[in-house]
Amino acid sequence: MKKSSKEISPSQSLKNGGSDHFFNTSLMYVLAACLASFIFGYQVSVLNTIKNFIVIEFGWCTGNKVECDDSTLKSSFLLASVFIGAVVGSGFSDYLVQHGRRFSLLVIYNFFILVSILTSITHHFHTILFSRLLSGFGVGLITVSVPMYISEMTHKDKKGAYGVLHQLFITFGILVAVLLGMAMGEAPDAKSVDALGEFQKIWWRLMFFFPCLISILGIVLLTFFYKEETPYYLFENGKIEESKKILKKIYGTDNVDEPLKAIKDAVEQNEAAKKNSISLMRAMQIPSYRNVILLGCILSGLQQFTGINVLVSNSNELYKEFLSNKLITTLSVIMTVVNFLMTFPAIYIVEKLGRKTLLLCGCAGVTLAAFLPTAIANQIDRSSDLVRNLSIAATFVMIISFAVSYGPVLWIYLHEMFPSEIKDSAASLASLVNWVCAIIVVFPSDIIIKKSPTILFFIFSGMSILSFLFIFFFIKETKGGEIGTSPYITMEERQKHMGKSAV
């Protein structure tokens, strides 16, 4: 059979940014979006190493017990404020992405320029709390906007691998935040009455300012180099030729009839749903739609109960129960390096093993890591060196298990499991649930850690077992699926309900 004149060879495809190679044209678009993912990770982790320095400079705890108890509460609010803001942001993200995926990223970058400046000049608890709430709002926008942009801007066979880059850049942001925090020196006790040095007074403010520079870079890239919207959004808004043009870049070939047809089908299904008024509220009244929405929300919420954000945002406080101040920051750095490096394998195995298998493996790893120190602590002295060493080792195994599975896979899965007519709103709802659960987990972590770290590990172990069983029995594989489709709802089922709603 003779080759079509529109088809090109693999070598030609590679020259044009071919889809058969990981480093291609669409990767550049994805990386421009992943700068927002970096800001996400940085904002979640930045307080981990500098929280006590802020407590000392603002004089929240000067030795008085009541005053210091109040300081602990203020610290808890600062830790949780990002997650509280993210709840609001993720709820608003559905509205934002409807105006364009690239547009939403530009809004996010401009927003973080303002927030970074505001946080860096704060001098009071209320202003820093407000600034952190705003940071959380921006993070909430990122949780939906970036995965959606990646999902719509990549080759069908690379959605998994490129989707992992979102989580990779989150872990990179976490790592950079901890590394910059090392410049502050040894982590002080929050009850210290010693004044901070001049460098320390300036540096923690510069750390809050740093995302401003990343945001400016993101704006430059999206304004001057990667100016196109996603092909799905372009097609949806009647710009078919522009959609075809960007698809040619993504697939590295002039023959984009198949992906264009997939987008056309998804857009038509979505338009039919809009015309027939199938909103999120309407979908919740239909059993098949309600089922997939609830599954997505439960899967998203359970991710937080594995305990990852306690390890990321409060590891210094956790390690303080086991180690001297000299080792705390060093160990936190090692943990974030491990978190960053172990995200790389997920890029290559997410398409080979599939989403469900990776999720199951990750939950099994977290369960074993969290259960072992808890079980031993119940048999011997909880304060023994063995329990302490096992607890520290468990945090590393938990981080590794999460980094190769639940961390990156969830955000890929949420944009593959929902049918196109509810994808935007359902993904936003699932993201909102994720952040609500993060607040529930992170806010009391300071108090629980001071009481007994083994209680935390017991909770994480139990929730990971529950997550494993939930995924095993209820979650379906989405690997290789077409954009806008869902393994939970057949096309016939969708058309039937859309037809009914029109009656």
Curated annotation (Swiss-Prot):
Sodium-independent facilitative hexose transporter. Can transport D-glucose and D-fructose. Can transport D-mannose, D-galactose, D-xylose and D-glucosamine. InterPro entries: GLUT, MFS_dom, MFS_sugar_transport-like, MFS_trans_sf, Sugar/inositol_transpt, Sugar_transporter_CS. GO terms for molecular function: hexose transmembrane transporter activity. Belongs to the major facilitator superfamily. Sugar transporter (TC 2.A.1.1) family. This is Hexose transporter 1. It is found in: Cell membrane. The keyword Membrane applies. Disulfide bonds join 61-68. Alpha-D-glucose binds at residues 167, 303-304, 309, 411. Residues 1-26, 98-102, 154-163, 227-291, 351-356, 413-428, 476-503 are cytoplasmic. Pfam families: Sugar_tr (PF00083). The keyword Cytoplasm does not apply. Keywords: Cell membrane, Disulfide bond, Membrane, Sugar transport, Transmembrane, Transmembrane helix, Transport. It is a multi-pass membrane protein. The chain crosses the membrane at residues 27-47, 77-97, 103-123, 133-153, 164-184, 206-226, 292-312, 330-350, 357-377, 392-412, 429-449, 455-475. Homodimer. Beta-D-glucose binds at residues 167, 303, 309, 339. Residues 48-76, 124-132, 185-205, 313-329, 378-391, 450-454 are extracellular. Inhibited by compound 3361 (3-O-((undec-10-en)-1-yl)-D-glucose). Coiled coil: none annotated. GO terms for cellular component: plasma membrane. NCBIfam families: SP. It catalyses: D-glucose(out) = D-glucose(in); D-fructose(out) = D-fructose(in); D-galactose(in) = D-galactose(out); D-mannose(out) = D-mannose(in). Signal peptide: none annotated.
